[in-house]
Amino acid sequence: MALSLVLGLALSALVIGIRPQVAVPFGLSVLGSALLGSLLLPVLRRWKAGQVIREEGPQSHHKKAGTPTMGGLSFLPVGLLVAGIGSGWDPQWLAVALLTLAYTVVGWLDDWLVIRQRSNKGLSAKSKLLLQVGIGLVFCGYLAWQGIPTVLTLPGIGALPLGWLFWPLALFVLVGTNNAVNLADGMDGLAAGMVALVLAGLGLTAADPVLALVAFALSGTCLGFLVHNHHRARLFMGDTGSLGLGGALAGLALLGDQLWALAWMGAVLVAEALSVILQVGYFQYTKRKTGQGKRLLRMSPLHHHLELGGWSEVQVVGCFYGLTALLVGLGWAWWHWAGA
């Protein structure tokens, strides 16, 4: 709870001090998300929408079995609604909202299958990837129709023309960010807190005031969710929340020409995803070479490696919050110094 409180106070001070015009939407999102979570919790308990824990996961997580999931339903609609009202239903808001909701539906379907089957197997990996790619292709089509510049901008350095290579990169960012947030959602408060910070960073460095408003509204709604998701969590966001948040992050970065900010400020999320890729790749490589698969980490993603090394959940979450906050601060300083 202390970590969530510190994070909330820090982000509130940041908003009021640097972007006071979004303070009201930010605050409304925090309060609305916390309230809707309180209303949704008993409903999810009645529906017996409890999380199924992986057998191969850390033993300490098995006691979390049965904790209500699908918590994304309690905070994503709040942030999107507040941002929609605040922006006057601007087309930029609509694009982010539809992308977020599309990925939220994929996550909800996965959560629903897990609950229905009482196993940790929801959508197959292939089915989920196909849906993620399909939604990503539609969004890329929208970006092309809007005629956005196919460049990679770095503050203080300039714009790197990518031409047609921009589109594979955009699709990779959409699908990759989705999965990075999903993988980071493995400890109480971890994904929600880190994403709240990265969203705030995107809001601070956004040139478009509408995108800044959307980013801060969604950052606030993540903070409100932490009321129920901090250690020991009473509500999990599930894939419903993590895939939706991943879509929002990627959509904001692509629309706002902020891929640099997403990569830099979200580097801990990137590390979480890379840890899984490296773990799987190294295991398969050593198994093919020696007949015996070996692991680089005790367990992936990275947060489980640290946990099995003796770190408590609170220590891991606090460390990842601190690293993300540092990256956001340095990213904002870089952007500010460059005069962007």
From Swiss-Prot:
The chain crosses the membrane at residues 24-44, 69-89, 95-115, 129-149, 156-176, 196-216, 235-255, 260-280, 316-336. It is a multi-pass membrane protein. Pfam families: Glycos_transf_4, MraY_sig1. Its main location: membrane. GO terms for cellular component: plasma membrane. The keyword DNA damage does not apply. One of its GO terms (molecular function) is phospho-N-acetylmuramoyl-pentapeptide-transferase activity. PROSITE patterns: MRAY_1, MRAY_2. It is found in: Cell inner membrane. Keywords: Cell cycle, Cell division, Cell inner membrane, Cell membrane, Cell shape, Cell wall biogenesis/degradation, Magnesium, Membrane, Metal-binding, Peptidoglycan synthesis, Transferase, Transmembrane, Transmembrane helix. Signal peptide: none annotated. One of its GO terms (biological process) is peptidoglycan biosynthetic process. Its cofactor is Mg(2+). It comes from the Bacteria. Pathway: Cell wall biogenesis; peptidoglycan biosynthesis. Its EC number is 2.7.8.13. It catalyses: UDP-N-acetyl-alpha-D-muramoyl-L-alanyl-gamma-D-glutamyl-meso-2,6-diaminopimeloyl-D-alanyl-D-alanine + di-trans,octa-cis-undecaprenyl phosphate = di-trans,octa-cis-undecaprenyl diphospho-N-acetyl-alpha-D-muramoyl-L-alanyl-D-glutamyl-meso-2,6-diaminopimeloyl-D-alanyl-D-alanine + UMP. CDD domains: GT_MraY. InterPro entries: Glycosyl_transferase_4 (IPR000715), PNAcMuramoyl-5peptid_Trfase (IPR003524), PNAcMuramoyl-5peptid_Trfase_CS (IPR018480). Belongs to the glycosyltransferase 4 family. MraY subfamily. PANTHER family: PHOSPHO-N-ACETYLMURAMOYL-PENTAPEPTIDE-TRANSFERASE (PTHR22926), PHOSPHO-N-ACETYLMURAMOYL-PENTAPEPTIDE-TRANSFERASE HOMOLOG (PTHR22926:SF5). NCBIfam families: mraY (TIGR00445). Catalyzes the initial step of the lipid cycle reactions in the biosynthesis of the cell wall peptidoglycan: transfers peptidoglycan precursor phospho-MurNAc-pentapeptide from UDP-MurNAc-pentapeptide onto the lipid carrier undecaprenyl phosphate, yielding undecaprenyl-pyrophosphoryl-MurNAc-pentapeptide, known as lipid I. This is Phospho-N-acetylmuramoyl-pentapeptide-transferase. It comes from Synechococcus sp. (strain JA-3-3Ab) (Cyanobacteria bacterium Yellowstone A-Prime). The gene is mraY.
